[in-house]
Structure formats: C-alpha cells, structure tokens
Curated annotation (Swiss-Prot):
PANTHER family in UniProt: LARGE RIBOSOMAL SUBUNIT PROTEIN BL19M, RIBOSOMAL PROTEIN L19
HAMAP family per the UniProt record, alphabetical: Ribosomal_bL19 (MF_00402)
Keyword Ribonucleoprotein included in the entry's annotation: yes
Functional summary from the UniProt entry: This protein is located at the 30S-50S ribosomal subunit interface and may play a role in the structure and function of the aminoacyl-tRNA binding site.
The protein, known as: Large ribosomal subunit protein bL19
Name of the gene this protein is made from: rplS
Family of this protein: Belongs to the bacterial ribosomal protein bL19 family.
Gene Ontology annotations for the cellular component aspect, listed alphabetically: cytosolic large ribosomal subunit
Superkingdom per UniProt: Bacteria
A molecular-function term among this protein's GO annotations: structural constituent of ribosome
UniProt entry keywords in alphabetical sequence: Ribonucleoprotein, Ribosomal protein
NCBIfam families listed in its UniProt record: rplS_bact (TIGR01024)
Amino acid sequence: MAANIIKELEREEAQRLLAARAIPEFEPGDTLRVNVRIKEGERERVQAYEGVCIARSGGGVHESFTVRKISFGEGVERLFPLLSPSIESIEVKRRGVVRRAKLYYLRDRRGKSARIAERSNVRKVEVADAE
C-alpha cells in the first residue's frame, strides 16, 4: 500500500513539473543543445552544452539523459536529470537514425565512424503536427 502512495505522489509531481516547462520529444541519437544555469559565487549564467543524446534512463521524476560531445579532441559526457531546475531549456538540433536505445558504442569510435545519419522523415511529422 505504501509503495502505491509513493508511486502516485511521484507521478503527480512529474506531471506538475512537465506542465510547468516545455520539454521537447527526443530520443537517443538526436543532437541536443541543453542550456544549463551555472552558479559561480554570486553570479549566475547560462551555458549551452551541445552534443548527441546517447541514453535516456529512469522514469517519472527520476528520468535522466546522457549527452556526449567532443571537446578539444576529448569525449565529454554529461548526465542531466530531465526535470532538473538547473536546466533552462532543451533544443533538438538534429534528429538521428539509430537502432539502439543506448549508444555507448560511440565511446569507442572517432571521426566519421562516430557519425549518426539524420532522420529524413522529420518534415512529414512537423507538417502533420501543424494540421
């Protein structure tokens, strides 16, 4: 009985947080720009982190996603909680075609072998949503 109450409260909290902000639909393989609020002493600024979403995990309040980018020749991964208040916005830059839910194999690849093909049917989906 207690587990059901906790699940119910978490579901309600997730719905409340999702209603308060616009989080776009994205999947592993998509290129994202995540604008993150960073506090440095008294100042607060927004930093853009752009890379490929390589994984989504969890659900509800605990859902998170991992973004990987190459910075100065080194691979950098960052794990973001989806409903974190430090995330100001998420933009989908490119839609990728992948056949896996977890793209951890990209860690071992460099250069052209690490590229992800762009989804070509994105325009049709946007037109269908507009109608």
